[in-house]
């Protein structure tokens, strides 16, 4: 188990280092591509494993690890496909259907080739334990030749899938750009309408304030005029009352002096 863990760890580390170098030189690989690359390197390392290592690796251990890599690659491939489908949008029905069909067919081909590689490696490990010396070299040479062909098929499957997905991803990006370009005039028009409405509301508010100010001034003028008219109307009565009161005061003062 320990040898198996070390071997798998070495494969993953090597694949990660290769991915880092390639990412600097080219572009970042999708996760499903990285998983297939790990699987291919895994197959290669197992086919080149020394006698003492092959004796310690059980088919069940190897099968579980390779099954996990196959499962991860298929799941990551479908996740990548869904991401591209979402970017294509619901309007691109035909393109989405083509993408789904292409990835399903090519993905199944990749899965079958990975399953076959796993079977061949298990077969190699089983035969390697039963022979020794020159016979082991013959088995290794025969199986190694077939595994090299399988690795080439895996590389071809991966490249074909990558090209397809890259083309669809490019179309999805162009589709999004087209949608943005189509929506931009609407956005600008909506912005202009909003600004026009805001300005109209500001103008209407200003006119309303001016109208209210004029009305207030008119009301103040009306009240002032009404007060003046009331004062003018009451003034004779007040003057008459003042005269009468003064007369009464004069009479009272005269009586007091007598």
Curated annotation (Swiss-Prot):
GO biological process: acylglycerol homeostasis; cholesterol efflux; cholesterol metabolic process; chylomicron remnant clearance; high-density lipoprotein particle assembly; intermediate-density lipoprotein particle clearance; lipoprotein biosynthetic process; negative regulation of amyloid fibril formation
A GO CC term attached to the entry: extracellular vesicle
Localization, UniProt: Secreted; Secreted, Extracellular space; Secreted, Extracellular space, Extracellular matrix
Principal subcellular localization: secreted
Domain of life the protein comes from: Eukaryota
GO molecular function, one term: phospholipid binding
Pfam families the record matches: Apolipoprotein (PF01442)
Keywords noted in UniProt: Extracellular matrix, Lipid transport, Lipid-binding, Repeat, Secreted, Signal, Transport
Family: Belongs to the apolipoprotein A1/A4/E family.
Protein purpose: APOE is an apolipoprotein, a protein associating with lipid particles, that mainly functions in lipoprotein-mediated lipid transport between organs via the plasma and interstitial fluids. APOE is a core component of plasma lipoproteins and is involved in their production, conversion and clearance. Apolipoproteins are amphipathic molecules that interact both with lipids of the lipoprotein particle core and the aqueous environment of the plasma.
Protein name: Apolipoprotein E
Organism of provenance: Alligator mississippiensis (American alligator)
Lineage of the species this protein comes from: Eukaryota, Metazoa, Chordata, Craniata, Vertebrata
């Amino acid at each position: 188990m320990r040898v198996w863990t070390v071997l798998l760890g070495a494969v993953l580390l090597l694949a990660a280092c290769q991915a880092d170098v390639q990412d600097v030189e080219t572009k970042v690989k999708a996760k499903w591509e990285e998983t297939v690359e790990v699987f291919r390197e895994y197959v290669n390392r197992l086919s080149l494993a020394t006698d003492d290592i092959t004796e310690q690796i059980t088919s069940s251990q190897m099968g579980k690890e390779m099954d996990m890599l196959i499962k991860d690659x298929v799941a990551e491939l479908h996740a990548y496909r869904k991401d591209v489908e979402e970017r294509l949008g619901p309007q691109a029905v035909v393109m989405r259907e083509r993408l789904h069909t292409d990835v399903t067919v090519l993905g199944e081909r990749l899965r079958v080739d990975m399953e076959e590689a796993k079977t061949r490696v298990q077969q190699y490990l089983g035969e390697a334990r039963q022979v020794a010396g020159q016979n082991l070299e013959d088995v290794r040479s025969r199986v190694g030749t077939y595994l090299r062909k399988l690795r080439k098929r895996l590389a071809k499957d991966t490249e074909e899938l990558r090209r397809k997905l890259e083309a669809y991803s490019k179309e999805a990006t162009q589709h999004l750009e087209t949608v943005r370009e189509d929506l931009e005039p609407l956005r600008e028009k909506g912005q202009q309408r909003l600004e026009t409405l805001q300005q109209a509301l500001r103008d209407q508010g200003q006119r309303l304030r001016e109208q209210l100010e004029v009305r207030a001034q008119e009301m103040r003028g009306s009240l002032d005029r009404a007060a003046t008219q009331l004062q003018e109307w009451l003034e004779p009565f007040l003057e008459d009352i003042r005269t009468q009161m003064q007369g009464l005061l004069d009479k009272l003062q005269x009586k007091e002096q007598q």
